[in-house]
Amino acid sequence: MSTRTARSLGPDLVLAGTVAKRAEILVVGLTSGPDGPEIALSEGIVAEDVLAEILDSLIAVGATGKPEQLTRVPAPSALSVTSVLAVGLGSADKLDSEQIRKSAGAAARSLSGIDTVATTLSILDLGAAAEGFALGAYSFTEFKSSMTAPGPDSQPLARVELLVPSPRTKETKATLARSAAIAEAVATAREFVNTPPSHLYPAEFAARAKALGVEAGLTVQVLDEKALEKGGYGGIIGVGKGSSRQPRLVRLEYASKKRGARKVALVGKGITFDTGGISIKPAAGMENMTSDMGGAAAVISTVVLAAKLGLPVNVVAYVPMAENMPSATAQRPGDVLTQYGGITIEVVNTDAEGRLILADAMVRAGEDNPDYMIDTATLTGAQMVALGNRTPGVMGTDEFRDRVASISQSVGENGWAMPLPEELRGDLDSKVADMANVTPHRWGGMLVAAHYLKEFVPEGVQWAHIDVAGPAYNTSGPWGYTGKGGTGVPVRTMISVLEDIAVNG
């Protein structure tokens, strides 16, 4: 079985029972231990004496099995490949799916210029290995000219043969199909985030979201600026009116074939570029605000993925899109706007715009009577101050918040449950409107933003808010299966939550 994740988004993933002659390199896992490194399980696919020869070569050049350590040695003559790449897995007794995923990604990143590899990592965990290789090999080169585009010797890895004992079973094929679909969804979210705002503005973003939705069989509706104005979407209009690029609201609905299936609303912040508006940001690092639609990218990719997987759960996604710019028509600090549904807001700071567009979309999503609601956004710098750039903050109704955070940790996206202290809500009181969009102080900024959003969650709906301000965009060096730029977080969390709801309600 072979499955291509998407054009240029990842390598061809192929199930195999033996190392084919086409493969140039065999990738194996190496665990560490008190008695030295060991090659991880191979299920008889590679002969024991050959593995022993490989291990001797690896030890001779100093391989230890340290997590994601890469060591390449010539292949024994008994193998058809030219070399063996060992990737460290760490201690065998601590090995889990996420480490396999990260190690596979590290291997994939090191294999530019290689057409085909075979790997035994898939014997340990087929799904994790497939996702790791696919995401590690992802690259974004759309805007590279012929002068700087990767040449033949530096193209991303093209094909991965995933070695398993029984490559033709229905269960094995289904596992690979799911993992390939997840990798494609994550890569699609990365593509959106990495596309510059000159090419991905609200109207274009909406058009691309619609095209993906229609292709997946979703019901799609796009509201333009006139429809938003007429409908009373004051938050989206207020944020977007400073830009010549008019705002949009996209609705994508996946209807399960299962009678009585639970309904989940997904809402994602889609600020295609954020200058801060009149409350303008410092110039240093502002170019990274191309990532301020990371939540929207993840939501679009997730609802499309739910349809492709045929999940027995209903999903309705709302994606508000706007560009936050300073101009003569931009909203001002001190303005008052009316959110969809009627709550009036004093705009104290125009750089706290994400919550304004999310609130409109959340109230509208509530009209679809969901059982659960998840919103996600690159919402606050305070998230990075509190949790760093790899740990999303998860807030919301206690039980569902903890459920989402637990699932996020299990899939390697590491969401962390955070409280919503009641005393912080009072800091959003306004003298001129129902609420202010920020507090007069900077304490607990991530939690205050969640308190703001909580005001727009319908009564009785289980809700989780995932702040991915840091985790959605990697500004440091590559690691594991994550390169620089868009990461696709929290697609894997949200699809796993949908799967969990489909099974457990």
Swiss-Prot record:
Organism (species): Rhodococcus erythropolis (strain PR4 / NBRC 100887)
Functional summary from the UniProt entry: Presumably involved in the processing and regular turnover of intracellular proteins. Catalyzes the removal of unsubstituted N-terminal amino acids from various peptides.
Primary localization: cytoplasm
Subcellular location, record wording: Cytoplasm
Cofactor note: Binds 2 manganese ions per subunit.
PROSITE patterns recorded: CYTOSOL_AP (PS00631)
SUPFAM superfamilies, per the entry: Macro domain-like, Zn-dependent exopeptidases
Reactions it catalyzes: Release of an N-terminal amino acid, Xaa-|-Yaa-, in which Xaa is preferably Leu, but may be other amino acids including Pro although not Arg or Lys, and Yaa may be Pro. Amino acid amides and methyl esters are also readily hydrolyzed, but rates on arylamides are exceedingly low; Release of an N-terminal amino acid, preferentially leucine, but not glutamic or aspartic acids
Pfam families to which the protein is assigned, alphabetical: Peptidase_M17, Peptidase_M17_N
Residues reported to bind Mn(2+) 2: 269, 274, 292, 353
Name of the protein described by the UniProt record: Probable cytosol aminopeptidase
Lineage, highest ranks first: Bacteria, Bacillati, Actinomycetota, Actinomycetes, Mycobacteriales
Cofactor(s) needed for function: Mn(2+)
Bilayer-spanning residue ranges: none
EC number: 3.4.11.1, 3.4.11.10
Binding, Mn(2+) 1: 274, 351, 353
GO biological process, one term: proteolysis
Keywords, sorted A to Z: Aminopeptidase, Cytoplasm, Hydrolase, Manganese, Metal-binding, Protease
InterPro entries according to UniProt: Leucine_aapep/pepB (IPR011356), Macro_dom-like (IPR043472), Peptidase_M17_C (IPR000819), Peptidase_M17_leu_NH2_pept (IPR023042), Peptidase_M17_N (IPR008283)
GO CC, any one term: cytoplasm
